[in-house]
Regions:
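Surface-exposed interaction/gating patches
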Residues: 169-257, 264-270, 286
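Vicinal oxygen chelate
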Residues: 11-22, 27-36, 54-57, 87-183, 202-226, ...
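Residue-level signal for short segments within beta-strands and strand-turn junctions
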Residues: 70-72, 85, 151, 229, ...
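An N-terminus-focused feature that recognizes amino-terminal "leader" regions
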Residues: 21-89, 95-105, 112, 116-120, ...
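Cationic, low-complexity basic patches in intrinsically disordered or flexible, solvent-exposed regions
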Residues: 3, 8, 16
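Short amphipathic beta-strand starts and helix->beta connectors
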Residues: 84-88, 161-164, 227-233
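Conserved active-site tyrosine of GNAT-family acetyltransferases
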Residues: 41-46, 68, 118, 144, ...
Length: 335
């Protein structure tokens, strides 16, 4: 299905110029959150949630901190929920933040399985409810990370992990949608539609407020942002149990370079192109201050480890390998 074009405001690109662009982000690539308790984090996400630890590495900008990647059985882009190990106080919730992360499962039976499993583990879990036409199950991890399991209707392919503690038919299939809370919706919408080529898909009521859905690529829950405007709360303060950034998928390096050019032409401050070894990254902040990343689908996590043994040892990109002994000495054991 050919994706529909967004309607630009014209603030960043004139309409004639916009019509020349066919670039499309294809969905959520990964989401990176913050944990101050990495051992507990590993037990919750790899143990209770049954996700696969596909990469145990370090924050490339602060090698004293772990960077843990949880994903599906084949470590595919769009399934990665990742955590920085930062010893921070708890997040102060508020606006201008990524306020909820949704994880996709297949069917109401899966949600019932998860409700019972989470309750038995003493997790703060609510009842199954319908939101935006999809059944969902909101819950929080031990640090207050806000999560929701949603029924994606089995859309798209799935890659269960054979060694998971969760039966294959109930395993988490991937990310999305991602919920943002912003002070000024119009400014965020301008960037999402006129720069990032998303389209305003629909609206629905949630928690007594209006939620606006922005879709990318072919759409669907793996390719949506749900944005709520909140002009009452103060801005969130980043901390443990909060989210650091969300990344969006671009299929190859040619489009990745084109996105860099596009941000520069729109005069949006950005990080410039960064090689993260497992993928290429480009960071920038939308107008309300939330950190976005555009990331390539490849090369992937099997670049430096066999697929069969992903996550079993500390992996370091080549430029950090000479410092392995010092880095390992500075990390606390996870197991």
């Amino acid at each position: 299905m050919k994706p529909a074009k967004a309607k630009p405001s014209g603030r960043f690109f004139p309409k004639s110029r916009y019509e020349d662009y066919v670039m499309q982000l294809t969905g959520i690539h990964h989401l990176t959150a913050i944990s101050a308790r990495p051992k507990e984090n590993l037990s919750f996400y790899a143990g209770l949630l049954g996700m696969r630890l596909v990469k145990k590495t370090v924050n490339q900008d602060d090698v004293s901190a772990y960077h843990l990647f949880y994903a599906d059985g084949e470590a595919r882009p769009g399934t990665d929920l990742t955590f920085f190990d930062f010893p921070l106080p708890p997040e102060r919730r508020g606006t201008n933040s990524i306020s909820r992360t949704c994880l996709r499962v297949n069917g109401e039976q899966s949600l019932s399985f998860w409700r019972d499993r989470l309750k038995q583990a003493g997790v703060n879990v609510r009842d199954i409810v319908e939101v935006d036409g999809r059944l969902s199950l909101p819950f929080e991890d031990g640090e207050g990370q806000r999560l929701t399991l949603i029924d994606d209707g089995g859309a798209g392919s799935a890659s269960p992990w054979a060694k998971s503690s969760v039966p294959a038919e109930f395993q988490i299939r991937g990310l999305g949608p991602i919920v943002l809370t912003v002070h000024d919706l119009a400014r965020t919408e301008d960037v999402l539609t006129s720069v990032m080529n998303m389209r305003r898909a629909r609206e629905y009521a949630a928690h007594g407020a209006r939620m606006v859905v922005f879709a990318m690529g072919e759409g669907g829950p793996a390719a949506e942002l749900h944005v709520i405007e909140d002009r009452e709360q103060p801005a969130a303060r980043q901390g443990a149990g909060g989210v650091h950034h969300v990344a969006f998928r671009t299929p190859d390096e040619a489009q990745y370079h084109a996105w860099t050019q596009r941000l520069n032409e729109a005069r949006i401050r950005n990080s410039g192109e960064i090689d993260r070894f497992y993928f290429r990254s480009l960071y920038f902040r939308e107008p309300n201050g939330i950190l976005f990343e555009i990331a390539t689908d490849g090369p992937g996590f099997a670049t430096d480890e066999p697929m069969a043994t992903l996550g079993e040892k500390l992996a370091l990109p080549p430029f950090l390998e000479p410092r392995r002994a010092a880095i390992e000495a500075g990390l606390k054991p996870l197991g």
